From Swiss-Prot:
SUPFAM superfamilies: Ribosomal protein S5 domain 2-like. GO terms for biological process: tRNA 5'-leader removal. The lineage of its organism: Bacteria, Pseudomonadati, Campylobacterota, Epsilonproteobacteria, Campylobacterales. It comes from Helicobacter pylori (strain HPAG1). Coiled coil: none annotated. GO terms for cellular component: ribonuclease P complex. Belongs to the RnpA family. It comes from the Bacteria. This is Ribonuclease P protein component. Its EC number is 3.1.26.5. RNaseP catalyzes the removal of the 5'-leader sequence from pre-tRNA to produce the mature 5'-terminus. It can also cleave other RNA substrates such as 4.5S RNA. The protein component plays an auxiliary but essential role in vivo by binding to the 5'-leader sequence and broadening the substrate specificity of the ribozyme. NCBIfam families: rnpA. The keyword Hydrolase applies.
Length: 166
């Protein structure tokens, strides 16, 4: 086959990287925000708040994986055999990956872990998208509110210490 007739293969790089090992999943489970509904659980860790490299005993923090490559967010999928056979599990994983690709701007700077339940298979893509967006927006709002509260506490603490000194 001549080279001119061959189709150009232009692969777009995906904007996410996957969580690779148990320690990365455990970090998101322990330090991240959790949200549950009937169909899946969503664990979200804000990577902008991850400690820098070398602090708190982390050899390679998750936030460094975003800076090294051109990835926007990290994605982990944990689909157990209770959900169904391999065909059902792979369908759920494909749908969840495409959801995060579709809404990559919302997921930017986050590490996401999905844990689907057995009822998740019966949802169509649009219903799954609706539940995903509700959960993600509520988690992002919670993160923003907690940051504001933390900033207020730190500012008031600084004001009190300055008043004590002078």
């Amino acid at each position: 086959m001549p080279d001119e007739l061959r189709a150009e293969k232009s692969f777009q790089s995906k904007p996410y990287d996957s969580l690779k090992n148990k320690s990365e999943f455990d970090r998101v489970y322990q330090k991240g925000f959790k949200k549950h509904n009937l169909f899946f659980s969503l664990f979200v860790l804000d990577l902008s708040k991850e400690p820098p490299k070398g602090k708190e005993g982390f050899k390679d923090p998750l936030s460094c994986r975003l800076k090294d490559k051109k990835t926007l967010y990290l994605l982990g999928l944990s689909v157990s055999k209770k959900v169904g056979n391999a065909v059902k599990r792979n369908l759920i994983k494909r749908r969840l990956r495409s959801l995060t690709l579709k809404h990559a701007a919302l997921c930017q700077g986050l590490a996401l872990v999905f844990v689907p339940r057995s009822d998740c298979y019966h949802l169509d893509f649009w219903a799954l998208e609706k539940h995903f967006l509700e959960m993600l927006t509520s988690i992002k709002n919670y993160i923003e509110q907690s940051l504001k509260r933390l900033e207020k506490r730190n500012n008031s603490y600084l004001c009190e210490t300055i008043k004590r000194l002078f």
